[in-house]
């Protein structure tokens, strides 16, 4: 009998009481890992634990709002107290406070940054501290977003946090390499409670709710699917099979898998003495013509047969 790839491993998944995080936790458990569920609500966390235990897996709950060091420490201690060790951290916890720039308050900005960006920082730091002190060649997986890669209207706070996470991952990979620890970002594209309210995705959501596969346009052309479509990538990155992969941003959704490039110049020009205003005014238009980058994710037209119902 083939041994499960994560047998004997212990994973923390932040924000795993429901949604994407729960799907990640359930798949990690299915592949043999013992899992620490994290949520801010005790009942939600307990239900998530029960869903894993009912399938023969091992899980415990740590109820804490991710962001501060105290929560990160509680998660690490919870893993070690329950299962004796820690091998994998999946940073998934997040909140949304979507508003256009002039309507976004300091509180809207700070909360999203605290949970996503600071929460990733504190949880990774305390997990890596454990890895270093105990000689564990562990796995760090943080969740990014297409919004962090491309930008999106009304999500200044979220875009900043998710872009920052990918930047931190590249730095973590450099700092952790000698310890044998890998750090990667996953960019998921999957149905959530939010996408259910967007008419563009109506036919995909309806198919999923009927237990049917989403139309190929969504799964293939958009790379849009279910949480389960992303969970396999999370589990693979957590395994020994992915020990050579670090510092990467990898997208998953529907039938599509994407490896994102690091930011790289598309135009490089030199001018002796540097680039003054006058030199730029004279040459920049020609140098940048056809090379300026777009902002936001571009959606292909929705086929006629997949148009949302009217009324």
Give each language-model segment a name.
Residues 4-36:
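Canonical Rossmann dinucleotide-binding motif of NAD(H)/NADP(H)-dependent dehydrogenases/reductases
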Residues 23-24, 30-31, 150, 166, ...:
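Active-site-adjacent segment of SDR/Rossmann-fold oxidoreductases
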Residues 42-43, 63-74, 106:
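The beta1-alpha1 cofactor-binding region of Rossmann-like NAD(H)/NADP(H)-dependent oxidoreductases
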Residues 100-101, 105-113:
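Substrate-binding pocket helix/loop in short-chain dehydrogenase/reductase
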Residues 124, 161, 169:
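Active-site helix of classical SDR
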Residues 145:
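Residue(s) in the substrate-gating loop at a strand-loop-helix junction
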Residues 207-311:
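C-terminal helical subdomain
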């Amino acid at each position: 009998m083939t041994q499960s790839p994560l047998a004997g491993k212990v994973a923390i998944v932040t924000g795993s009481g429901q949604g994407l995080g729960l799907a990640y936790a359930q798949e990690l458990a299915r592949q043999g890992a013992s899992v620490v569920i994290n949520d801010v609500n005790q009942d939600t966390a307990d239900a998530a634990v029960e869903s894993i235990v009912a399938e023969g897996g091992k899980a415990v709950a740590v109820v804490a709002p991710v962001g501060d060091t105290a929560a990160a420490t509680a998660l690490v201690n919870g893993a070690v107290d329950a299962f004796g060790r820690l091998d994998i951290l999946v940073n998934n916890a997040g909140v949304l406070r979507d508003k256009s720039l002039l309507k976004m308050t300091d509180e809207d900005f700070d909360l999203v940054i605290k949970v996503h960006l600071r929460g990733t920082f504190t949880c990774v730091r305390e997990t890596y501290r454990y890895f270093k002190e105990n000689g564990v060649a562990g796995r760090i997986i943080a969740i990014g977003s297409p919004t962090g890669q491309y930008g999106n209207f009304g999500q200044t706070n979220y875009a900043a946090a998710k872009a920052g996470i990918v930047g931190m991952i590249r730095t973590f990979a450099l700092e952790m390499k000698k310890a044998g620890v890998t750090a990667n970002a996953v960019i998921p594209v999957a149905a959530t409670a939010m996408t259910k309210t967007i008419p563009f995705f109506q036919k995909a959501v309806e198919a999923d709710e009927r237990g049917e596969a989403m139309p190929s346009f969504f799964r293939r052309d958009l790379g849009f699917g279910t949480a389960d479509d992303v969970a396999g990538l999370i589990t693979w990155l957590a395994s020994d099979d992915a020990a050579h992969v670090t510092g990467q941003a990898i997208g998953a959704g529907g039938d599509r898998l994407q490896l994102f490039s690091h930011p790289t110049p598309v135009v490089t020009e030199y001018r002796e003495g540097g680039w003054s205003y006058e030199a730029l005014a004279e040459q920049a238009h020609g140098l940048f013509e056809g090379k300026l980058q777009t902002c936001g994710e571009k959606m292909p037209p929705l086929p006629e047969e997949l148009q949302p119902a009217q009324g």
